[in-house]
Amino acid sequence: PARHLSVLCNQMVNFLGIMQNEWAGAQAFSSFDTYLAPFVKVDNLSYPEVKKCIEAFIYGVNTPSRWGTQAPFSNITLDWTVPDDLAELPALVGGVEMDFKYKDCKKEMDMVNKAFIETMIEGDSNGRGFQYPIPTYSITKDFDWSDTENNRLLFEMTAKYGTPYFSNYINSDMQPSDVRSM
């Protein structure tokens, strides 16, 4: 298993590229920000280092890789806040339980989200938006609606591209953890 964010991002790109040749339809990673945050924490990565890794992931999944020169149809879900069912679990990095929990990685989650959204807003070298991955953000009772930097970026991306999708867990019978069982 990957022990560093840069390696993990490369492995995810390769996985999506391979799987899109094996299965029809979108391939997805759930709780993207929650699961990547411990890698940021363990290596004490700076924001520019995190952004470089996330950029590599986004550019990688937008690289045509199969007959018909199509990029892998890919989705990611982002939790924005640590889900209750993961909060108290020991974080995993490189297949090893860390001495901290997922709930201890909120700062790193925010870095992953900021890097992802900024890269999506910036677009490619010609300023065009990225087709993939299609992001879905979980809106829960814990969503902080205040005027934060990440909220401004999230809604700027929404206004600019009409993406992401939002999963409304406030007025739903579903739980945020259900996304990992779909």
Which sequence ranges carry the predicted segments?
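Conserved catalytic cores of very large enzyme subunits
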Residues: 1-182
